[in-house]
Amino acid sequence: MRKALFLSILFFLFLNPFFSQEIVHTEDLIAVELEELEKEKGFTEDEDLEELVTEEPPASLEDKEEKIPHHSLPGIPDEILQRPDVEKFRQQYLSEKWSKLLYQYLEDAMEYRLYVRKAIQEKEMPAILEYLPVVESNYKTNAKSRSGAIGMWQFMANSVWPFLTLNDFVDERLDPWKSTEGALKKLNDNYNYFQDWLLAIAAYNCGVGAMTKCLKKAQEKNYWYLVDHNLLPSQTAHYVPKLLAIADLAMNSKYYGIELPDHEQEFKELINERDGNFDYLEVNKAYSITQLAQEMRIDEDSLKHLNPSFILGMTHPTKKSQIRLPLGMKEPAQEAIKKLTPIEFPFKYTVVAGDSLWSISRRYGVTVQAICDLNNIKENAILKIGKVLYIPKK
């Protein structure tokens, strides 16, 4: 019989006042941008896209001056980059508003973006994948979509296994390093299945099962055939064109006359987060990240920044956890952990019909506020049947 785990709530809250991280809620980025683009340009149908290109010819690959060469995207024919659906997104990001936003996304994401670039090169995967997190989340590590996808790579809860860990204490979707490894593994699995990178990327959006069904209806095993014959979900049909447009602009910013950061110099001198080179401390009990930082005499926020997957601000109470540390800090962490007392965690209660925070608090002899503080919920929260609550020790 498993031994029950208990927590002294006052002690825990005093030492760990922040045990959940803020989530940036994002809408469906492609849908929102298409809506804005339609309002600004006044088009809604595919024929309007062609009219846009006809009325205001873009700086096409042929029309540009020879002195600024256009660099082809590896594995992507130039004629693909001139498709109207790719051009639509390219024109969007060439506008003053969106070019500034794209610059900001890429600049703010430098630490993680360079790690993604390094990982892609090491795995010999397509260079355009560096820009997939822009499509997914604008490189926001704590992004959350309306559909429930979370993190820089927007994993759904039902699609994390076997790539990432997700439980009551750990959500690796919020970890930019682990989620990058998980996303690239998933993309590589998709490629091994479809033997086509554009299909693999599109399947990352709609799922392998959905893509397989679409291909069964197609006469050609080709992403653009699926797009041109309206065999894909709308979002997936726009997914790859947006990625190609962003990658083209980022890799040819001078050609298109816009300023975008490439961070080539920083990539030559990878350090810390950019390199993904850390020390780790393995534990198998619940330890407060705040307490550990204080005992090590290092900045608490910095240690939490390296360990965003610990959603309650502490390691798992019964399973092995790896605490990510700045390089060279493993020995100080080992000494510090010896001085800490593992947190006694409370037992779990599953909400049933008729429950309220007040009735649960009365049943277990604790205050409503104590339950709310421990579970990071408000006193007026509506409890859903099946929700798991942690009940603090009296």
List the predicted regions and their residue ranges:
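Substrate-binding clefts and substrate-entry loops adjacent to catalytic sites
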Residues: 90-104, 139-146, 153-195, 215-230, ...
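Primarily a LysM-type cell-wall glycan-binding module
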Residues: 265-300, 341-367, 378, 383-389
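Extracellular LysM carbohydrate-binding repeats and other cell-envelope/extracellular binding modules
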Residues: 302-339, 367-394
